[in-house]
């Protein structure tokens, strides 16, 4: 490595190559989506905390999912909004590495929380008489905390491998935030180990957990079909359909981006997929759960009636 090599200490996020007018339109639109994300997920967390009838394992995990979605959006969207207003405004090296680490942490944690939530539904429908014994508060807390810890530890592995790399090729990141594969393309050193770990990590936290969710829901479907009453079947399907929608949105986009073919898939297409993944998914999750969930809707109505009475 030459002594005259200049190392990069800040990056410029290229974002989306659009006209200034279109960038201002996207700024207004994404700001609105961001506000809806914070409001929707914040409302879910608030309702679960306020109503003791929602103090059950299912809503306990849902509150953690809402917190992850808030953190997910707060990590990527503000920087994206800044770049829409000022496309050449740089992000520091430390800020970029922090954003990469936090994105991976929240993404992995959400993967694992969705698995835990599917297991909760499996126990509730397939083993209803043993549900309280199996899904005790100690077990639920352990599952939630373990999901967060694994998310942090796996992200630390990627960060430790990323930090020693010198960046001297270019300071322009072809993305709207510091996404790890886009950052690796700027390194002026061998990144084969990093790329292998990204793929291995994606397979371990996406394909493996998704397979376990599929198995859980296969068992759930079998149990639902054995229910005699149509009302019981309808209620069971309604309980699981919200979670299945969220699983499909999250895992579908994530698997295409990180486990799909390395070649032949346009970079811009994956960038827009990740935009959907990081901006629209967190906004849609509270809508999916609240629209399909009578408990959440009833709690919201009670809170609104109480506020009007005051």
UniProtKB/Swiss-Prot annotation:
<keyword id="KW-0325">Glycoprotein</keyword>
<feature type="transmembrane region" description="Helical; Name=7">
    <location>
        <begin position="274"/>
        <end position="291"/>
    </location>
</feature>
<feature type="topological domain" description="Extracellular">
    <location>
        <begin position="1"/>
        <end position="24"/>
    </location>
</feature>
<keyword id="KW-0552">Olfaction</keyword>
<protein>
    <recommendedName>
        <fullName>Olfactory receptor 2A7</fullName>
    </recommendedName>
</protein>
<feature type="transmembrane region" description="Helical; Name=3">
    <location>
        <begin position="97"/>
        <end position="117"/>
    </location>
</feature>
<keyword id="KW-0716">Sensory transduction</keyword>
<dbReference type="GO" id="GO:0016020">
    <property type="term" value="C:membrane"/>
</dbReference>
<dbReference type="GO" id="GO:0007608">
    <property type="term" value="P:sensory perception of smell"/>
</dbReference>
<dbReference type="InterPro" id="IPR000725">
    <property type="entry name" value="Olfact_rcpt"/>
</dbReference>
<comment type="similarity">
    <text>Belongs to the G-protein coupled receptor 1 family.</text>
</comment>
<feature type="glycosylation site" description="N-linked (GlcNAc...) asparagine">
    <location>
        <position position="194"/>
    </location>
</feature>
<keyword id="KW-1003">Cell membrane</keyword>
<comment type="function">
    <text>Odorant receptor.</text>
</comment>
<keyword id="KW-1015">Disulfide bond</keyword>
<keyword id="KW-0297">G-protein coupled receptor</keyword>
<feature type="transmembrane region" description="Helical; Name=6">
    <location>
        <begin position="240"/>
        <end position="260"/>
    </location>
</feature>
<feature type="topological domain" description="Extracellular">
    <location>
        <begin position="75"/>
        <end position="96"/>
    </location>
</feature>
<feature type="disulfide bond">
    <location>
        <begin position="96"/>
        <end position="178"/>
    </location>
</feature>
<feature type="topological domain" description="Cytoplasmic">
    <location>
        <begin position="118"/>
        <end position="148"/>
    </location>
</feature>
<keyword id="KW-1133">Transmembrane helix</keyword>
<keyword id="KW-0807">Transducer</keyword>
<feature type="topological domain" description="Cytoplasmic">
    <location>
        <begin position="292"/>
        <end position="310"/>
    </location>
</feature>
<feature type="topological domain" description="Extracellular">
    <location>
        <begin position="261"/>
        <end position="273"/>
    </location>
</feature>
<dbReference type="GO" id="GO:0004984">
    <property type="term" value="F:olfactory receptor activity"/>
</dbReference>
<keyword id="KW-0675">Receptor</keyword>
<feature type="topological domain" description="Cytoplasmic">
    <location>
        <begin position="226"/>
        <end position="239"/>
    </location>
</feature>
<feature type="transmembrane region" description="Helical; Name=4">
    <location>
        <begin position="149"/>
        <end position="169"/>
    </location>
</feature>
<dbReference type="GO" id="GO:0004930">
    <property type="term" value="F:G protein-coupled receptor activity"/>
</dbReference>
<dbReference type="InterPro" id="IPR017452">
    <property type="entry name" value="GPCR_Rhodpsn_7TM"/>
</dbReference>
<feature type="transmembrane region" description="Helical; Name=1">
    <location>
        <begin position="25"/>
        <end position="45"/>
    </location>
</feature>
<feature type="topological domain" description="Cytoplasmic">
    <location>
        <begin position="46"/>
        <end position="53"/>
    </location>
</feature>
<feature type="glycosylation site" description="N-linked (GlcNAc...) asparagine">
    <location>
        <position position="4"/>
    </location>
</feature>
<keyword id="KW-0812">Transmembrane</keyword>
<dbReference type="GO" id="GO:0005886">
    <property type="term" value="C:plasma membrane"/>
</dbReference>
<feature type="transmembrane region" description="Helical; Name=5">
    <location>
        <begin position="205"/>
        <end position="225"/>
    </location>
</feature>
<dbReference type="GO" id="GO:0007186">
    <property type="term" value="P:G protein-coupled receptor signaling pathway"/>
</dbReference>
<dbReference type="InterPro" id="IPR000276">
    <property type="entry name" value="GPCR_Rhodpsn"/>
</dbReference>
<feature type="transmembrane region" description="Helical; Name=2">
    <location>
        <begin position="54"/>
        <end position="74"/>
    </location>
</feature>
<dbReference type="Pfam" id="PF13853">
    <property type="entry name" value="7tm_4"/>
</dbReference>
<feature type="topological domain" description="Extracellular">
    <location>
        <begin position="170"/>
        <end position="204"/>
    </location>
</feature>
<keyword id="KW-0472">Membrane</keyword>
